[in-house]
């Protein structure tokens, strides 16, 4: 009987201890929850203050940037090194393939290396030319084959192709020059030449016929020894093949029949202000050259004093 009383007392003590523990846990939970509410309230208050201060600035959106740790930096470096190695190997393979393509082209040169785009263009033209040879039965050494090969290529590449085929660098342009020469010959047989002058009206000056031009003899009289004059006349200059000047009267040598004026037909003598030296004499006074034709004087506003006719001695 006494044992049962002891067991009952022990059970009551255990229950009372459990109740005390529950009360303690509840009080601790209440304290923690109160602290959490206070912290949340303070954080909300701080955020409200920041929003009021920075109300004009937009909020940053998107994923947050992770911190760069040593492990991440190392991973990035390894990834970049691998990407560079892949790109390097790809470019090496491309260059090797282009070099093999250059070797099978009809103009392979170790000194003059074709660019990538020129190599691809030449390969396209080569395939095109070979297909034409197979279809039409043409000769691979003709000019047509060379023209197909050089279509769309630059001038140095075209010269290289022509040199390798032993046709000369300008062989592909011979037919074109011949056609141009025939066109020029046919145009030279015409009678009318059109010259455009920018500063003059077109009716009498823009167009001119060949039969309207005639060469007048020079109106200047020689003032030196006739032998020197004949020597200078025999020395002729090569003809000028460029474009002719507009058909105006220049120096009284050229004139137009339709625009001829009486003043231009007059011949004016040339008189030198200096005394002429005798070409055959050794020493002595120089003889003056006088002409009976009156000289032509231009009106000049400023005063002009001629040089005195004094004797000139040769030393």
Curated annotation (Swiss-Prot):
InterPro entries the record matches: bHLH_dom, bHLH_transcription_factors, HLH_DNA-bd_sf, NeuroD_DUF, TF_bHLH_NeuroD
Keyword Disulfide bond: no
Main localization of the protein described in the UniProt heading: nucleus
Region (Disordered): 39-71
Acidic residues: compositionally biased ranges: 44-55
Bias (Basic residues): 58-70
Modified residues (Phosphoserine): 89
Post-translational modification as stated in the protein's UniProt record: Serine or threonine phosphorylation within the basic region may regulate neurogenic activity.
Pfam families named in the record: HLH, Neuro_bHLH
Boundaries of every bHLH domain copy: 78-130
Recorded GO MF terms: DNA-binding transcription factor activity, RNA polymerase II-specific; E-box binding; protein heterodimerization activity
UniProt subcellular location: Nucleus
GO cellular component, one term: nucleus
Entry annotated with the keyword Nucleotide-binding: no
Tissues in which the protein is found: First expressed weakly at stage 12 in primary neuronal precursors. At stages 18 and 21, strongly expressed in the cranial ganglions, with weaker expression remaining in the spinal cord. Later, strongly expressed at sites of neuronal differentiation, namely the eye, forebrain and cranial ganglions.
Gene3D superfamilies per record: Helix-loop-helix DNA-binding domain
UniProt keyword list: Activator, Developmental protein, Differentiation, DNA-binding, Neurogenesis, Nucleus, Phosphoprotein, Transcription, Transcription regulation
Domain of life: Eukaryota
Quaternary structure and partners: Efficient DNA binding requires dimerization with another bHLH protein. Forms a heterodimer with the bHLH protein hes2, and weakly interacts with hey1/hrt1.
PANTHER family referenced in this protein's UniProt entry, alphabetically: BASIC HELIX-LOOP-HELIX PROTEIN NEUROGENIN-RELATED (PTHR19290), NEUROGENIC DIFFERENTIATION FACTOR 4 (PTHR19290:SF86)
Protein name: Neurogenic differentiation factor 4
UniProt source species: Xenopus laevis (African clawed frog)
Gene for this chain: neurod4
């Amino acid at each position: 009987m006494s044992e049962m009383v002891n067991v009952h007392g022990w059970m009551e003590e255990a229950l009372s201890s459990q109740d005390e523990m529950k009360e303690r846990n509840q009080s601790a939970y209440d304290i923690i929850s109160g602290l959490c509410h206070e912290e949340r309230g303070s954080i909300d208050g701080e955020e409200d203050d920041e929003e009021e201060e920075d109300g004009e600035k937009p909020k940053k959106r998107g994923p947050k940037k992770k911190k760069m740790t040593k492990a991440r930096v190392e991973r990035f470096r390894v990834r970049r090194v691998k990407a560079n190695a892949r790109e390097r190997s790809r470019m090496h393979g491309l260059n090797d393939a282009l070099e093999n393509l250059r070797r099978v082209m009809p103009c392979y040169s170790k000194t003059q290396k074709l660019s990538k785009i020129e190599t691809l263009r030449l390969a396209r033209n080569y395939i095109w030319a070979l297909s034409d040879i197979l279809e039409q039965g043409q000769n691979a050494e003709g000019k047509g084959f060379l023209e197909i090969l050089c279509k769309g290529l630059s001038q140095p590449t075209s010269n290289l192709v022509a040199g390798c085929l032993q046709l000369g660098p300008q062989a592909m342009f011979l037919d074109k020059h011949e056609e141009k020469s025939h066109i020029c010959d046919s145009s030279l047989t015409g009678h009318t030449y059109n010259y455009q002058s920018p500063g003059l009206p077109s009716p009498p000056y823009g167009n001119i016929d060949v039969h309207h031009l005639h060469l007048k003899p020079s109106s200047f009289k020689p003032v030196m020894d006739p032998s020197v004059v004949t020597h200078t006349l025999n020395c002729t200059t090569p003809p000028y093949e460029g474009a002719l000047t507009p058909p105006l009267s220049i120096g009284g040598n050229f004139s137009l029949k339709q625009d001829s004026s009486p003043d231009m037909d007059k011949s004016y003598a040339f008189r030198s202000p200096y005394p002429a030296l005798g070409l055959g004499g050794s020493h002595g006074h120089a003889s003056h050259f006088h002409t009976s034709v009156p000289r032509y004087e231009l009106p000049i506003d400023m005063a002009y004093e001629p040089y005195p006719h004094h004797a000139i001695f040769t030393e």
